[in-house]
Amino acid sequence: MIDPDGFRPNVGIILTNDAGQVLWARRINQDAWQFPQGGINPDETPEDALYRELNEEVGLEREDVQILACTRGWLRYRLPQRLVRTHSQPLCIGQKQKWFLLRLISNEQRVRMDLTGKPEFDGWRWVSYWYPLGQVVTFKREVYRRALKELAPRLLARD
């Protein structure tokens, strides 16, 4: 599903532990790291997509996490021209994302990247909250900055 402006609706997931660190996932067979994210199907709400993607990409269930916050609006990024599939219709030029800040309330051993036939990640680690800003691919950096900045007060206020 792509909107009239060419952006695919998507959810981004910032999963935190009790130390305030965030889950940072390595894309399969790449030296590229990112937060889990995924598309919203036509019959889903952003929250429905969050739980589906959380299970598909990280192996966690609804009961394993607590939603702390969600971004107020959609945050958009454009894909670099080399990643735009110019022969696909409708044309997708980027993603528009709702970001969710979650707290892991179960044991971290529940995190599994290999529960689907086509896993997106092959590794993960806990990193400091702001660490991803200097590590994520350049075209996603501004969206990460905006999401982390908007959601940071909720992480600090969680206790």
Swiss-Prot record:
Pfam families (alphabetical): NUDIX
UniProt key word Nucleotidyltransferase: no
GO-annotated biological processes: mRNA catabolic process
Name under which the protein is recorded: RNA pyrophosphohydrolase
Span of domain Nudix hydrolase: 6-149
Organism field: Pseudomonas fluorescens (strain SBW25)
EC number: 3.6.1.-
Keywords: Hydrolase, Metal-binding
One term under GO cellular component: cytoplasm
Gene Ontology MF annotations: metal ion binding; mRNA 5'-diphosphatase activity
NCBIfam families: PRK00714.1-1, PRK00714.1-4, PRK00714.1-5
CDD domains: NUDIX_Ap4A_hydrolase_plant_like
Function of the molecule: Accelerates the degradation of transcripts by removing pyrophosphate from the 5'-end of triphosphorylated RNA, leading to a more labile monophosphorylated state that can stimulate subsequent ribonuclease cleavage.
Family annotation (InterPro entries): Nudix_hydrolase, NUDIX_hydrolase-like_dom_sf, NUDIX_hydrolase_CS, NUDIX_hydrolase_dom, RppH
